């Protein structure tokens, strides 16, 4: 995995972030989703590195990055704090302006990063998400059944943590299988499981979702009408919820003055691992056209 990439632990204000770096060209920050780590990009990063300097990072609380104590308001794991981490990471690495691509939770961090640090992001690609606020506001029985984990993981007093800790493999495997339509994830799944076998990281991931259901929505409502001015690409899984429940291009177009492009991919939720060649092509075409 990640042949030709170097590993780095980068010191930021509140701890260390883990990332892999490789390639050359305009920086492209890759952010992962749940229940994963930066490893989810292992099929795509080496090819993307032929055109870009790739920085594949673990979000705080995930993978090998820092775990921080939670707080009653869940602000520690807000997307604003996670986005600030990534800005500090890019500062330390010497990158001023950059592209960002985020899947799932990473897409939500990328969106907040682009909103809070408007002069830094050249263009953004988000994979299999619509904005958090839109998704919560559209919640109905169909959505709740498909995204049950959104409502399970936010439960208080450590209940979801205790249940996941009782059998981490069953939880990780069920997420990967259910959301991909039964695909095999090979050695990557072991990397995800290694992180999800640590109680403090299970708790951190729950805090990520608790923040999304609270303080993140406050932030999103506060600047909802402040449009971005960057191109956005949205890729969604043909067999997933996003395309069935939303009109992704239309939803994202309401967030930027620039063009939104994108399409459905022949996948479930885990697009970069289910269709790596397609993702490589789409990301290359999009970012190279805006460079």
Language model regions located:
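Surface-exposed alpha-helical interface segments used for non-catalytic interactions
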Residues: 39-42, 46, 84, 111, ...
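Alpha/beta-hydrolase-fold serine-hydrolase catalytic core, especially in secreted/extracellular enzymes
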Residues: 199-200, 276, 290-291
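Catalytic histidine-centered segment of alpha/beta-hydrolase-like enzymes
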Residues: 268-276, 280
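C-terminal alpha-helix
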Residues: 282-290
């Amino acid at each position: 995995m990640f042949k030709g990439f170097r590993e780095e632990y980068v010191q930021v204000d509140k701890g260390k972030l883990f990332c892999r770096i490789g390639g050359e060209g305009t920086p492209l920050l890759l952010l992962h989703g749940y229940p994963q780590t930066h490893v989810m990009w292992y099929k795509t990063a080496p090819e993307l590195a032929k055109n870009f300097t790739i920085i594949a990072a673990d979000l705080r609380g995930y993978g090998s990055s820092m775990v921080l104590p939670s707080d009653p308001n869940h602000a520690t794991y807000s997307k604003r704090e996670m986005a600030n981490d990534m800005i500090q990471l890019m500062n330390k690495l010497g990158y001023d302006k950059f592209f960002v691509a985020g899947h799932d939770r990473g897409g939500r961090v990328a969106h907040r990063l682009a909103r809070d640090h408007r002069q830094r992001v050249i263009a953004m690609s988000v994979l299999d998400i619509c904005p958090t606020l839109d998704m919560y506001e559209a919640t109905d029985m169909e959505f709740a059944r498909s995204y049950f984990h959104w409502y399970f993981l936010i439960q208080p007093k450590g209940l979801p943590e205790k249940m996941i800790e009782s059998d981490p493999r069953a939880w990780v495997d069920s997420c990967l299988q259910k959301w991909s339509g039964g695909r095999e994830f090979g050695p990557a799944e072991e990397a995800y499981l290694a992180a999800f076998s640590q109680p403090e990281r299970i708790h951190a991931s729950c805090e990520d979702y608790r923040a999304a259901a609270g303080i993140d929505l406050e932030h999103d409502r506060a600047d909802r009408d402040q449009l971005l001015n960057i191109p956005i690409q949205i890729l969604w899984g043909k067999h997933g919820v996003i395309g069935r429940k939303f009109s992704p291009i239309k939803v994202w177009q309401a967030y930027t003055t620039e063009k939104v492009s994108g399409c459905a991919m022949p996948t479930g939720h885990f697009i970069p691992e289910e269709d790596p060649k397609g993702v490589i092509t789409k990301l290359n075409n999009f970012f190279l056209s805006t460079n």
